[in-house]
Amino acid sequence: MLFITSNRHKYEEAAEFLGNYNIDIKWKNMKYEEIQGDTNKEISMDSCRKLMYKIKDDFFIDDTGLYIDDLNGFPGPYASYVNKTLGNKNIIRLASGSRAHFETVISLFYSGKIYQFSGILNGTISDHESGSMNFGYDPIFIPDGYDKSLAELSISEKNRISHRSKALEIMVEFLKKQ
C-alpha cells in the first residue's frame, strides 16, 4: 500500500506504527494540490478524489490540523502554512498555555472506494520549544497526561498516543475486516 505524502516525518511515523501490524507501506513522495477547505476531512477527501485518477493502486493520504482554543481553532487545517510563515515562536507568543488539539484525517483509497478515519490528540501549547524530534508543532505541544512536548518523545512513544496513530489504528481495524 502507498502512503502519498511529501512529508518524510509523517511517513516514518506511519511506517513504524503499521509495521507493528505487519503492514508494509511504501512512501510515494509526491506533492499534490490541496484545496483551501474549512476542515481536514474536506481537504483530505478532495485530495484523495483527485489522486485516485492518477494512482491506480491502493493508497492513503493524511491531512492534519492544529486547533488552538484561545485562537478560535486557528490555525486549524492551515497548520502547515501557518507553521512555515509564523513559526512556533509566534504561536507561543499568541497562545502559550492555551488548550489545543491535533486532528488527523486519513483518506484511504481501497478497492475502488474512499474511506476516512480520524484521530484527535488533546493537549496544551507550551511556553517554550523543547525536544529534538523537531517536526511541525511537536516542540510546543504538550499532550494531556504528559509534562513534556511531543518532540521529546521517541517515535514509538509518540505513536502510542498521537492523533495520527489513532487514525491509523482505526484504518488497521477496517483493513482487518476486509
Curated annotation (Swiss-Prot):
Q: Where, in this chain's numbering, is substrate bound?
A: T5, S6, N7, R8, H9, K10, T64, F135, G136, Y137, D138, K158, H163, R164
Q: What class of enzyme is it?
A: hydrolase
Catalytic activity entry: XTP + H2O = XMP + diphosphate + H(+); dITP + H2O = dIMP + diphosphate + H(+); ITP + H2O = IMP + diphosphate + H(+)
Q: Which domain of life is it from?
A: Archaea
Q: Which InterPro entries does the entry mention?
A: dITP/XTP_pyrophosphatase, ITPase-like_fam, RdgB/HAM1
Q: Where is the active site?
A: D63 (proton acceptor)
* Note on cofactor: Binds 1 Mg(2+) ion per subunit.
Q: Which residues bind Mg(2+)?
A: E34, D63
Q: Which GO BP annotation is one of this protein's? A: purine nucleoside triphosphate catabolic process
Q: State the family named in the UniProt similarity comment for this chain.
A: Belongs to the HAM1 NTPase family.
Subunit: Homodimer.
Recorded protein name is: dITP/XTP pyrophosphatase
Per the UniProt entry, what species is this protein from, by scientific name? Picrophilus torridus (strain ATCC 700027 / DSM 9790 / JCM 10055 / NBRC 100828 / KAW 2/3)
